Amino acid sequence: ASGAARLEAASAGFGHGTANAHDEAAWLVLWRLGLPLDSALGDEPDSVANQPVTPAQQALVATLFEERIATRKPAAYLTHEAWLVGVPFYVDERAIVPRSFIAELLADGSIDGWLSDQTHDVLDLCTGNGSLAVLAAMAWPEVQVTGADISSDALAVARINVERHGLHERVHLVQSDALAGVPGPWDLILCNPPYVNAQS
C-alpha cells in the first residue's frame, strides 16, 4: 500500500505541518530520501516521482512510516524539522511543533504597521522552539528580539534555531515565567502560548 494509504488506514493524526495523509507521506518520503521538500512530484520528466529508488531506500522509507504509525509522533519529531512560511526549523520533543498564524502575519508584513522608527525591542513570549523570534528578526533587521520561555528544554531547541539562522547577535533567549524575568519595556510583544495538553 502507498504511504498515504497506510497513514489513513492507521488513522494517523495530522496538523503538525501537514493537513492530510498525501502531503505527510510525500514529506516523509522526500525527507528520508534526502530530496528537497519542494521537489516536483507530477508526471513531468524531471519529477522525482520518476527517479529510481533502491531496495535499501525503500526499506528506510518503510521503517519511517512504521515508526510514524507505531509511535503516533508528529512527523516533525521524527524528521526533527518543521517549516513555517517556507523557513525550516529544528524541532524535537523538548518543544511543541511550531504552528502559528502569527508567522504568516510576520511574513506578509501585516504587523509592520504596528512598528515605528522607535521600535527597537521585541519580545516573543512563550518562544518555544524560537521560530517566531527568528521570523521577527528576519522581518525586521533593525530590531533586537528576545525570546522568553519557562522551559529550559524549549530554550535549548530555540538556541539551535537562532544559531541555524545566524541570528545569535540579534535574538537573545531568556528563561522566564511569563514576564517575571523580562520586565521590559518592550515596543512589541508577540505571544503564541502553548494551547495543547501533553496528550495532544
Functional labels for PLM-detected ranges:
Residues 8, 12, 83-89, 171-179:
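Generic detector of contiguous secondary-structure segments
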Residues 10-15, 109-117, 166:
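Alpha-helix termini
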Residues 1-4, 31, 90-103, 122, ...:
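Conserved long hydrophobic alpha-helices within structured protein cores
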Residues 1-84:
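N-terminal auxiliary segments of SAM/dcSAM-dependent transferases
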Residues 139, 143-144, 148-200:
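S-adenosylmethionine
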Residues 51, 59-141, 148-157, 175:
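SAM-dependent Rossmann-like transferase core, predominantly class I methyltransferases
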